[in-house]
């Protein structure tokens, strides 16, 4: 799949998650070593391929903003454009200013391609300062490479 296209492989479909997906979502999120504690299936979109959950991502709602989070592609389905498709799809679904935090320069570069730019904790809306501020504390104390990013509308 071309990064600029919005087409999924023919054997895949995107849909809102259902309560039956939570176990598979948790498994995917856990496999990526992401925090599995803030998973509300109602906020997730999933890509199902050949009857199995191949990717997931969520839009978490905060006061006046949203966070793109928990975006994971199953190992067997990587390098087929599912992460790019889901990122673009979630950007289109967002109804408020959109933020994310990611680990490592590689992920930050990935999100930059979709119009996200790095921002500091001081630039964050109040509703995200505490949550993302904790990540920045971990970055400082434990040298964890956390990047906070904001989507700049019109960059897609």
Regions found by a protein language model. Give the residues of each.
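A short beta-loop-alpha structural element at the N-terminal edge
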Residues: 12-24
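Helix-loop element at the rim of GNAT/NAT acetyltransferase active sites that forms part
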Residues: 16, 27-38
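A short helix-loop-beta-strand connector motif used in the catalytic cores of GNAT acetyltransferases and
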Residues: 34-50, 67, 142-145
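Conserved beta-strand in the GNAT
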Residues: 46, 52-60, 65-72
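Conserved acetyl-CoA-binding loop-helix of GNAT-fold acetyltransferases
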Residues: 79-92
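Conserved GNAT acetyl-CoA-binding A-motif
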Residues: 92-105
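Conserved active-site alpha-helix within GNAT-family acetyltransferase domains
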Residues: 104-132
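Acidic/histidine-enriched, glycine/proline-rich intrinsically disordered or flexible terminal extensions
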Residues: 132-156
């Amino acid at each position: 799949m071309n990064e600029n296209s919005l087409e999924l492989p023919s054997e895949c479909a995107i849909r809102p998650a259902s309560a039956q997906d939570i176990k598979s979502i948790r498994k995917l999120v856990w496999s990526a070593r992401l925090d599995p504690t803030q998973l509300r299936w109602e906020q997730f979109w999933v890509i199902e391929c050949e009857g199995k959950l191949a990717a997931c991502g969520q839009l978490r709602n905060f006061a006046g903003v949203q966070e793109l989070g928990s975006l994971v592609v199953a190992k067997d389905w990587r390098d087929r454009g599912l992460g790019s498709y889901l990122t673009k799809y979630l950007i289109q679904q967002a109804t408020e200013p959109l933020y994310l935090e990611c680990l490592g320069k590689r992920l930050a570069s990935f999100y930059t391609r979709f119009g996200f730019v790095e921002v500091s904790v001081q630039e964050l809306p109040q509703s995200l300062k505490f949550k993302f501020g904790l990540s920045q504390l971990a970055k400082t104390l434990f040298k964890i490479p956390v990047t906070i990013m904001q989507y700049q509308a019109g960059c897609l």
